[in-house]
Amino acid sequence: INLLKIAKGIIKSL
């Protein structure tokens, strides 16, 4: 699990 990838996904979702 990549926290950076998840964080980037959340930012992109915004």
Curated annotation (Swiss-Prot):
Leucine amide, modified sites: L14
Keyword Membrane: yes
Compartments, as annotated in UniProt: Secreted; Target cell membrane
GO CC annotation terms, alphabetical: extracellular region; host cell postsynaptic membrane; membrane; other organism cell membrane
Keyword field: Amidation, Antibiotic, Antimicrobial, G-protein coupled receptor impairing toxin, Immunity, Innate immunity, Mast cell degranulation, Membrane, Neurotoxin, Postsynaptic neurotoxin, Secreted, Target cell membrane, Target membrane, Toxin
Expression across tissues: Expressed by the venom gland.
Modification after translation, per record: C-terminal amidation is important for the stabilization of the secondary structure in alpha-helical conformation and for activity. The non-amidated analog eumenin mastoparan AF1 (EMP-AF1) has a lower level of alpha helical structure than the amidated peptide, as well as a reduced antimicrobial potency on both Gram-positive and Gram-negative bacteria. In addition, this non-amidated analog shows a reduced mast cell degranulating activity and is devoid of hemolytic activity.
Chief location bin: secreted
One GO biological process term: innate immune response
UniProt keyword Zinc present: no
Recorded GO MF terms: toxin activity
Biological role stated in the UniProt entry: Antimicrobial and mast cell degranulating peptide. Shows broad-spectrum antimicrobial activity against the Gram-positive bacteria S.aureus ATCC 6538 (MIC=5 ug/ml), S.saprophyticus CS (MIC=5 ug/ml), S.epidermidis CS (MIC=5 ug/ml), B.subtilis CCT 2471 (MIC=40 ug/ml), and the Gram-negative bacteria E.coli CCT 1371 (MIC=20 ug/ml), E.coli ATCC 25922 (MIC=50 ug/ml), and P.aeruginosa ATCC 15442 (MIC=20 ug/ml). Also permeates anionic liposomes. Has little hemolytic activity. Blocks the lobster neuromuscular transmission. Induces the depolarization of the muscle membrane.
Family: Belongs to the MCD family. Mastoparan subfamily.
Record's protein name: Eumenine mastoparan-AF
Organism: Anterhynchium flavomarginatum micado
